[in-house]
């Protein structure tokens, strides 16, 4: 029997993601038309082009590097969401775990003078501990991980502000410049910066994040541990009756998820690309954007690499829109539309499954009708 391409999981994920992207860009274009029709076409092209807006190849390379620098932490947050989701958990607390990674890595670098490796390990441990708290509450107190995650997000945000106030600049609310205070805490460039017009921020974080995506795929798809995690996600009771430690799996999955988010924070702030604003009153969007990247990537670690780059590419491209025609927030609006539509990826996959099932049912009915007709004609021929 010919295989229906609409039943292929890979094809469904790819098509659903492409539909979300096209629809998001189209809605963004409509918004631009409503605000100022004269510059809508040029504005949406600017968003898509991002660093290609620059005419000089050297500038294009440099700002392409900046996009990759911001893609690495987004990818790590997406992997954090994906890992927990495979166990049937929705780790909305990834934003707080990311905050914990920021706080511990920057304090260790600026306040304690540690090198980049112990700073990153401390960020990983901070995210893991925070994730394990949600896991313990879920396993032993039946507290929904979404509720505990949201509460912890705000607690950790204000703890981060309090801790990093001790290492901020005197005349501004931002933390001190990492390269000026402790150069040993800056992630090594591995010579990659030279490939992007001597971009000082491009370095270890980019290849390391891709390696982590491959590692997550191997763990989930090729190991006994990954099989047990997914089995727990499909049916917790069935996993328990099969001898699997379902409570342990829940705790470990959220712990690993938190570790990935914390590592993502270190990948950004230990490059020196950004400084933390100690007066911030909102949780970083990186953790929430990771949700969109995970779903846009079809909940596949390898697909998430491309999805993370696309979301960051569009977000960065919005900054180049002509501010004389559109307000500064228009780039965030366009990015938000695309990110919002990423939530419909699973809905689109369900619609494609329904369509494929109906097509198969019609084909089966036609085959049975043709078979019945052939038998009837054969019977008539025998009677003659």
Put a short name on every predicted segment.
Residues 1-21, 234, 241, 245-248, ...:
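Cytosolic-side transmembrane-helix boundaries in multi-pass membrane proteins
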Residues 2-76:
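Membrane-interfacial amphipathic/re-entrant helices at transmembrane-helix boundaries
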Residues 4-15, 85-92, 111-116, 120-182, ...:
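Short loop segments and helix-boundary regions at transmembrane helix junctions
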Residues 32-37, 53-111, 124, 128-143, ...:
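Single transmembrane alpha-helix segments in multi-pass membrane proteins
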Residues 50, 57, 145, 153-222, ...:
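Transmembrane helix-bundle core of multi-pass membrane transporters
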Residues 71-82, 97-103, 125-132, 154, ...:
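Hydrophobic alpha-helical segments embedded in the membrane of multi-pass proteins
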Residues 129, 196-276, 302:
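Helix-loop-helix "hairpin" substructures at the membrane interface of multi-pass membrane proteins
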Residues 260-261, 270-336:
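Transmembrane alpha-helical segments in multi-pass inner-membrane proteins
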């Amino acid at each position: 029997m010919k295989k229906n391409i609409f039943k292929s999981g890979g094809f469904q994920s790819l098509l659903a993601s492409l539909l979300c992207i096209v629809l998001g860009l189209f809605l963004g274009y409509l918004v631009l038309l409503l605000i100022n029709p004269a510059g809508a076409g040029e504005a949406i092209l600017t968003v898509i082009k991002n660093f290609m807006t620059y005419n000089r190849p050297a500038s294009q390379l440099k700002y392409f590097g900046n996009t990759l620098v911001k893609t690495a932490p987004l990818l790590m947050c997406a992997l954090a969401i994906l890992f927990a989701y495979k166990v049937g958990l929705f780790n909305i607390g990834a934003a707080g775990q990311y905050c914990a990674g920021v706080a511990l890595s920057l304090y260790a670098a600026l306040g304690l003078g540690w090198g980049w490796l112990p700073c990153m390990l401390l960020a990983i441990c901070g995210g893991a501990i925070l994730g394990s708290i949600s896991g313990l509450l879920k396993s032993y107190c039946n507290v929904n991980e979404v509720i505990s995650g949201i509460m912890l997000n705000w607690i950790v945000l204000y703890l981060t502000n309090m801790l990093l106030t001790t290492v901020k600049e005197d005349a501004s609310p931002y933390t001190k410049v990492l390269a000026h205070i402790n150069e040993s805490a800056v992630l090594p460039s591995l010579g990659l910066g030279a490939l992007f017009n001597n971009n000082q921020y491009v370095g270890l974080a980019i290849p390391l994040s891709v390696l982590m995506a491959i590692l997550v795929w191997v763990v989930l798809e090729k190991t006994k541990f990954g099989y047990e995690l997914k089995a727990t996600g499909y049916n917790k009771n069935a996993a328990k009756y099969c001898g699997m430690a379902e409570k342990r799996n829940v705790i470990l999955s959220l712990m690993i998820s938190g570790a990935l988010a914390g590592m993502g924070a270190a990948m950004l702030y230990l490059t020196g690309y950004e400084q933390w604003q100690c007066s911030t009153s909102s949780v970083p969007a990186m953790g929430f954007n990771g949700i969109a990247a995970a779903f846009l990537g079809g909940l596949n670690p390898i697909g998430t690499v491309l999805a993370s780059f696309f979301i960051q590419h569009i977000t960065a491209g919005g900054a180049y829109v002509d501010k004389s025609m559109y307000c500064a927030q228009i780039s965030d609006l366009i990015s938000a539309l695309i990110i919002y539509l990423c939530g419909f990826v699973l809905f689109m996959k369900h619609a494609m499954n329904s369509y494929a099932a109906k097509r198969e049912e019609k084909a089966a009915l036609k085959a049975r009708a043709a078979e019945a007709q052939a038998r009837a004609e054969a019977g008539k021929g025998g009677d003659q």
